[in-house]
Design a protein with these regions (language model features):
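Amphipathic alpha-helical dimer-interface segment in Rossmann-like NAD(P)H-dependent oxidoreductases
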Residues: 30-52, 66, 91-96
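Catalytic Tyr-X3-Lys loop
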Residues: 21-40, 55, 59, 83-84, ...
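Active-site helix of classical SDR
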Residues: 43, 79, 87
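Conserved mid-core segment of classical short-chain dehydrogenase/reductases
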Residues: 7-29, 52, 72-75
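A glycine/serine/threonine-rich, flexible loop-to-helix segment
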Residues: 15-18, 111-139, 179-182
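Short, small/polar-rich loop/turn modules that mediate ligand/substrate recognition or access, typified
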Residues: 98, 103, 165-167
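Residue(s) in the substrate-gating loop at a strand-loop-helix junction
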Residues: 63
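Short C-terminal tail/terminal secondary-structure segment
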Residues: 68, 155, 166-182
Length: 182
């Protein structure tokens, strides 16, 4: 099962001309609910079916934001931290109760240009925004990811090739999380 519920809420994004204290708390709560509960609830529902079957793999979608906090998106960052902790907890809980054939992992994508974040990362003329350029400059690959580049990791984590892998958060980010910038 790939659990890919999530995203951000426009009102939960702190504008360039705002401070953290201008944050709309209700929208931040909605972003946390969307991402964290949007992961926990389906994992519990489908996880029970997988556990009863005695074999399966659950993959939650985390984010580089859980490891390297992103500015302007408080609720999203907090929720992704929660997803990492929940993934580790759930993997342990299922393994201890149902054995080593039930696995839970997460992938933490770096910055991928998608329809969901296009307005945040590109200008109207198609050029990159300053924010996108900061991500590119902080990534050893010097580019944004293509969503198709997540497929290999997803296939691996769903397959028997990862039979001894559980409770892990795998970064797919062009080296962003690993690089200090020098």
């Amino acid at each position: 099962m790939i659990n890919a519920v999530g995203g951000n809420i426009p009102g939960a994004t702190i504008g360039d001309d705002q401070s953290i204290f201008d944050n709309k708390i209700q929208d931040t709560i909605k972003a946390i609910e969307l991402n964290l509960y949007g992961t926990i609830i389906p994992t519990l529902i489908f996880g029970e079916l997988i556990a009863e079957k005695g074999k399966g793999s659950i993959i939650n979608i985390s984010s580089l934001a859980a490891s390297r906090p992103l500015t302007r998106v408080l609720g999203y960052t907090v929720a992704k931290h929660g997803i990492d902790g929940f993934t580790k907890w759930m993997s342990t809980e299922l393994a201890l109760r149902y054995g080593d054939q039930v696995r839970v992992n997460a992938i933490a994508p770096g910055v991928f240009l998608t329809e969901q974040n296009r307005t945040l990362l590109t200008n109207e003329d198609g050029s990159y925004t300053d924010r996108a350029q900061k991500f590119i400059n902080g990534t050893p690959y010097r580019r944004l990811g293509d969503p198709s580049e997540l497929e290999g990791t997803l296939i691996y984590l769903l397959s028997d090739a990862s039979a001894f892998v559980s409770g892990e958060v795998v970064f797919v980010d062009g080296g962003f999380n690993s690089w200090c910038g020098v």
